[in-house]
């Protein structure tokens, strides 16, 4: 899973589900239990940080409290990083206020006058993990996971998280978690020493009992600097990490070197000085343009799931529906195993017995290859196979909610589908959508993006089911209207390159700039015509579908970084070469007149 992969359902606490005060407290047998009930999956924003600071202060001052336990409502202890950076723009960057507040809170937790235990469940991410590492002890549900996504987003972990991780585990294990592309289980050998495991059903009682035990026996409080005991091994891990880095890092990777400097400071400096050193680097990384670009794309990934159809229907009704699929053997081998692994019941259908047998055999061969390569166990393969069936005709008694067909199967399958069964067209590379709802993956061997091409009056539930299907295929779904945005954006960039190569003269601006301008201008047209919903969708389209560098944020974000007045001026210069490609779109003129940016349309 990449930094921009479709996020799994976080079950965030929103609206009435989030407590007004964000932190609830009850005291039982001398243990104060503080429960985070913050918005958006308990992400550590300024309000939640302030509420926690008040809650801890009150518990520490209460003579009837001997120990403190911190837990959380909802499916996650902390679902992710708080969105604290503004969109890319030419405005001078500001240090987010929450950085200092979280660091101060973690310092107070680390100096708690009473034993403080964190009871962890679900995802323990970013600021939530920094809080946990500052506590005296952690008690985790065996299904809990931990992650600092910041190193993959141009930043450093907040709240002294990298330091405390190294202090507890040593440099090698700390780097395993810091460099992990996805959350690690608390049972992972690298981080298992952090946690006392407890069954989920008994997590809170176990944490309360452990906190009370530590109050009675403070000598049992885990050593906060155990990871520094083997100094040669610590230094060796840092040497290996530095040896694996380029001698000269580009600007968007400077935070990687800073992270190693912080881990080195964890060993060489007194704790207070190391924390101050870390804080400077955390703030510096947050000010970088690449950090803002990564943050923009993270928001774009979540925002892309909000569509007119998602507002009109309940996503829950789009889940867990059996799928009828009429696919070529190659396409079935590509798509069906992942759907089966995700629990989808799939019925493959074909008019020809031989063709159906060939398609089923293609899926079986892919399963065998996955078992042989270690990507799946034999038991899992056999379990998945129970969810697959084949038919030569429709079963009127068991009509699926959704049918998926490749182009060759559209006509005959559509003619036989009963009323109420929606068909989605899987558009192969270069094809055109032929249904009310079509799925068009990005043209790549392993696509990360799938456009949901929606025609006029397409049923909202069908769009949602198609979006859910794309996510189950581990593709980021992007809703577009009537035609592919990616195809037009790629065509604009290619056309700009061709114009420059065949012109026989020096372009008015550097070639790369000319291609960027053409892409931005095409994106503006797609927004004006209603093909794309928002500028961030276009950025996500180019990053996931065309290899646009993530650290640049996407073409529309770059347009905002340039500034629309400068953008219009440069487009007018470029239009002398090709007016159709570079004449500023009217949307750009409208935004300038209103004093807006592309980001204001997100």
Enumerate the language-model features and the residues they cover.
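Intrinsically disordered, low-complexity segments enriched in small/flexible residues
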Residues: 2-18, 35, 49, 69-71, ...
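Gly/Pro- and small hydrophobic-enriched strand-loop and loop-to-helix capping segments
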Residues: 136-158, 193-207, 347-353
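Rossmann-fold NAD(P)-binding glycine/threonine-rich loop
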Residues: 409-467
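Glycine-rich beta-to-alpha active-site loop
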Residues: 103, 108-153, 157, 327-332
């Amino acid at each position: 899973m990449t930094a921009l992969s479709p996020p799994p359902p976080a079950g965030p606490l929103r609206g009435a589900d989030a407590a007004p005060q964000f932190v609830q407290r009850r005291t039982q047998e001398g243990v104060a239990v503080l429960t985070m009930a913050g918005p958006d999956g308990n992400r550590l924003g300024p309000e939640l940080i302030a509420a926690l600071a008040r809650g801890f202060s009150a518990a520490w001052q209460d003579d009837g409290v001997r120990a403190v336990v911190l837990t959380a409502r909802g499916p996650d202890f902390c679902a992710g990083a708080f969105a604290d950076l503004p969109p890319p723009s030419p405005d001078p960057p500001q240090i987010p206020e929450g950085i200092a507040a979280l660091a101060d809170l973690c310092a107070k937790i680390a100096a708690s006058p009473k034993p403080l235990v964190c009871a962890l469940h679900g995802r323990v991410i970013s600021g939530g993990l920094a809080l946990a590492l500052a506590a005296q002890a952690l008690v985790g549900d065996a299904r809990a996971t931990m992650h600092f996504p910041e190193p993959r987003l141009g930043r450093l972990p907040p709240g002294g998280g990298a330091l405390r991780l190294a202090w507890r585990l040593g440099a090698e294990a700390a780097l395993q978690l810091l460099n992990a592309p996805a959350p690690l289980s608390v049972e992972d050998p690298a981080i298992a020493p952090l946690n006392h495991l407890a069954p989920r059903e008994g997590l809170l009682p176990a944490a309360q009992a452990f906190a009370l035990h530590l109050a009675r026996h403070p000598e049992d409080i885990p050593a906060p600097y155990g990871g520094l005991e083997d100094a040669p091994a610590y230094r060796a891990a840092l040497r290996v990490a530095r040896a694996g880095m380029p001698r000269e890092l580009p600007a968007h990777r400077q935070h990687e070197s800073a992270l190693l400097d912080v881990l080195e400071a964890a060993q060489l400096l007194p704790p207070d000085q190391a924390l101050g050193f870390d804080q400077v680097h955390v703030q510096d990384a947050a000010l970088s343009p690449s950090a803002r670009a990564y943050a923009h794309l993270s928001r774009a990934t979540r925002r892309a799931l909000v569509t007119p159809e998602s507002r009109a229907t309940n996503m829950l009704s789009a889940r867990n529906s059996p799928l009828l699929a009429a696919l070529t053997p190659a396409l079935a081998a590509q798509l069906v195993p992942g759907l089966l692994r995700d629990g989808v019941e799939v019925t493959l259908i074909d008019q020809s017995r031989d063709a159906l047998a060939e398609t089923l055999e293609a899926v079986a061969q892919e399963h065998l290859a996955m078992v042989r390569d270690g990507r799946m166990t034999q038991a899992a393969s056999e379990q998945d196979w129970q969810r697959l069936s084949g038919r030569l005709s429709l079963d009127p008694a068991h009509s699926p909610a959704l049918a998926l067909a490749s182009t060759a199967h559209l006509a005959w399958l559509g003619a036989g589908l009963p009323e109420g069964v929606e068909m989605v067209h899987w558009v192969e590379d270069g094809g055109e959508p032929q249904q009310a709802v079509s799925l068009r993956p990005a043209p790549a061997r392993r696509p990360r993006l799938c456009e949901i091409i929606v025609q006029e009056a397409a049923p909202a539930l069908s769009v949602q089911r198609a979006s859910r299907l794309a996510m189950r295929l581990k593709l980021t779904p992007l809703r577009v209207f009537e035609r592919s945005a990616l195809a037009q954006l790629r065509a604009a960039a290619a056309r700009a390159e061709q114009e420059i190569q065949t012109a026989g003269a020096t372009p008015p601006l550097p070639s790369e700039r000319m291609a960027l301008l053409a892409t931005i201008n095409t994106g503006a047209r797609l927004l004006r015509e209603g093909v794309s919903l928002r500028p961030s969708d276009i950025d996500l389209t180019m990053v996931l579908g065309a290899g646009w560098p993530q650290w640049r944020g996407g073409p529309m974000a770059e347009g905002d970084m340039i500034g629309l007045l400068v953008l219009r001026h440069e487009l007018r210069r470029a239009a002398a070469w090709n007016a159709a490609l570079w004449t500023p779109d009217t949307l750009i003129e409208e935004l300038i007149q209103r004093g807006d940016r592309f980001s204001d349309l997100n």
